[in-house]
Amino acid sequence: MFTREITAKDVKATEKNRIRYSSKHIKHLPPGTITEFEWKDYCPLGFRLIQELEDINHDEYMKSICNDETLRKLSTSKVGNMFLLSKDDRFLIKILRKSEIKVILEMLPGYFRHIHKYRSTLLSKNYGAHSVKPIGGVKTYFVVMSNILQSDVFMNKVYDLKGSSQGRTNKKIKVRDKTILKDIDLDFCFYVDSLARHRLIKQTKLDCELLEDEGIMDYSLMLGLQVKGSCHGSIDELIPVYDSFTSRGSVDSNSSKFMKTASNSPDRSSSTMYSCTPSRNSVDSENSVNIQSVASISPSPAQTNASDSPYESLVSKTNLTNIFQNSSSTNFGMKIPGRARRVGRGESGSVVGKQSREGGEEWYDVILYLGIIDIFQDYGVRKRLEHCYKSIQHSSKTISAVHPKMYSSRFQDFVSQIFLPDEDPSH
């Protein structure tokens, strides 16, 4: 419930806690495991307001991010090298520099006003900024965000897109064994309902205007691509749904032999974090973690909410109008139906249709999941120096390190180029 704005006093506030494993829990840990940490929350009240706005229970949030597996990974990882996912896929954790945490905090009042005013924003939700320090160790800063790609279906491809090209190819970055592809790897353009595209372009503009005003650049469009009727494997191994020489009917995903529910997905059984349940009455209970020696946390079985069909809640074209005209919708960017067209690059860099082996263009019925992530980089000294260095070697139009105004304009142009209106009356 939105009750007030985030103030400058809120932004400066911090809370410190000490996390200490119980004696019984230590017995179950490998030798040499760090068992005591200093934990710090930044702008705790401000982030609580965001959690309330997004219907995030604070106790469940803390149980998801504060467990021995997460603490171990956070205290041994380097900046930018890793994403951590909660077992229920709700939260995405990224390690940041101290300067990036500062940027998040400084923009928090304006960011909060924006996500409250525009409930269909594409911006990832920042639920908390924290630091953790093993006793005698090095402090690690991190942010907890919404997982834009949270889904009960397998993603055939996942992209991190900036609208630039220099250095924008896959560097084997993975989230839960899924390779994150980049701009150079993108060989599709997407056709979506014209109303959906209009809403997408409009919301992207509003979100980019906020980021531009806050001096933010180097953000990305996270895009998940799920082919209807497929299960696991690469989209490159699939037969196109239709091409220019076949009838343009869509595949019946419910009858496809490839259909499989998420509960049977081996990819989702290997998680980087696990959820926990509290036991405040038993501080030294087995497998507990003590926060200020008051609250203890113990592992609980993972919850599975997979339906019989991953497409039961798929947005159909008959109700697209209601969805995209409702400015209070918080699910915009999730489960957008469309068609993916395989494309290549012409000599001038323009997008051209790519021929399949049978001679027609490759098309796929897809579900799209998208949002804007990494909204914590300002155009400071480090990025200005990067711009000077790279612009000597490459065109400034192709590099990521550019002024926020130029970055915003290029990003919006890129989104409008890869998402096109689907005006095919037969689809």
Curated annotation (Swiss-Prot):
One of its GO terms (biological process) is phosphatidylinositol metabolic process. It catalyses: a 1,2-diacyl-sn-glycero-3-phospho-(1D-myo-inositol 4-phosphate) + ATP = a 1,2-diacyl-sn-glycero-3-phospho-(1D-myo-inositol-4,5-bisphosphate) + ADP + H(+). GO terms for molecular function: 1-phosphatidylinositol-4-phosphate 5-kinase activity; ATP binding. Keywords: ATP-binding, Kinase, Nucleotide-binding, Transferase. SMART domains: PIPKc. It is an enzyme of class 2 (transferase). Residues 1-419 form the PIPK domain. Its EC number is 2.7.1.68. Residues 379-400 are annotated as: Activation loop. InterPro entries: PInositol-4-P-4/5-kinase_C_sf, PInositol-4-P-4/5-kinase_core, PInositol-4-P-5-kinase_N, PInositol-4/5-P-5/4-kinase. Residues 247-287, 334-355 are annotated as: Disordered. SUPFAM superfamilies: SAICAR synthase-like. PANTHER family: PHOSPHATIDYLINOSITOL 4-PHOSPHATE 5-KINASE 10 (PTHR23086:SF111), PHOSPHATIDYLINOSITOL-4-PHOSPHATE 5-KINASE (PTHR23086). This is Phosphatidylinositol 4-phosphate 5-kinase 10. It comes from Arabidopsis thaliana (Mouse-ear cress).
